[in-house]
Amino acid sequence: LQVQTIFDAETGLPALHAPITTMLVAVLVLVAAALWWLSGRMKTDCAPEEPEDALALPHRETGWILIAAAVLAAFGSAYLFFKEDSTLMKAAALLGILSAPVLAMMPQLPRWGGFGAALSVMPVLFFCLWLVVFYKENAANPILWEYGMEILAIAMCLLAVFRLSAYLFYRAKPRRAIFACMLALVTSLATLTDSVSLGARAVLGGWGIGTAVMCWIIINNFVPPAPEEDTY
C-alpha cells in the first residue's frame, strides 16, 4: 500500500514525510511489540491438547467477528459464482459458499466429533480447487506481478485452513498454525490493494480476517504449564 501511494503521480519521486510512511513505522513498532509479547508467552505457556480447549471462544464478541468475516467471504463467493463463466470456477465458488459457515462455526466444530472434522476439510478443498483453477487461468500470463500476490494469498489461506483443520484431527501444531494464519492475513490484505475482482477481494478479506481471529483464539487459549508434582 505504501509503494502504491507514496510516489508522486507527476514527478515519479517518493513524497517526503508522507502520512502512509508514518503510519507504516507505527505499524512496524506495534508488530515488533506484539511479536515480543507472543514470543515470551509461547516460551512460558502451553497450548491445550484438546481441540475443544484450544479453539474455545474467549468472548462472545469474538464469535460475532467470525460471523461477520464469514458473511463477507460468503458474499464474495456468491459474487464469483454469478459473475464467472468457467464451470470449474463456479464449482470453486460454490464450495466457497458452503465453506463460509464452517469459518463461523470453527470454534464449535470440536464438539461435533468426526462430523466436525469432516466439515473442517471443506475450506481446504475450496482453496485447493480455487488455487488450481486460478493458476490454470493465469499460467499463460507472462506478467507474474499481475496475479502473483493473489495466488500467494490463496495459497496462504489454504495453508491456514489446513493447519486449523489439523486441530480437529488431533494433529495440531500451534506455532505453525499461528504463523500460517498471520501469513494468510498479511497476503490477503496486501491483495486488497491490487486490481482484483470484488468477489476475490471479499473472499480473501473475509478469510484473512477469519484466520486472524482464529489465530487470536489459539494464542488466547494458551495456558500456564501444569506444576510438576514432587516425587519422593
Would you name each region that the model predicts?
Residues 1-4, 31-37, 149-232:
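C-terminal transmembrane-bundle signature of multipass membrane proteins
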Residues 60-80, 89-104, 117-134, 150-159, ...:
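Alpha-helical transmembrane segments of multi-pass integral membrane proteins
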Residues 1-92:
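N-terminal topogenic module of multi-pass integral membrane proteins
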Residues 46-58, 105-118, 166-175:
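Membrane-interface helix-boundary motifs at transmembrane edges
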Residues 36, 77-80, 103-107, 215-218:
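Structural signal for membrane-spanning alpha-helices in multi-pass inner-membrane proteins
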Residues 29-46, 99-108, 158-165:
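Canonical alpha-helical transmembrane segments
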Residues 2-22, 78-94, 109-115, 132-151, ...:
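Membrane-helix interface and helix-disruption motif detector
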Residues 36-37, 64, 112, 130, ...:
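A residue-identity detector for tryptophan
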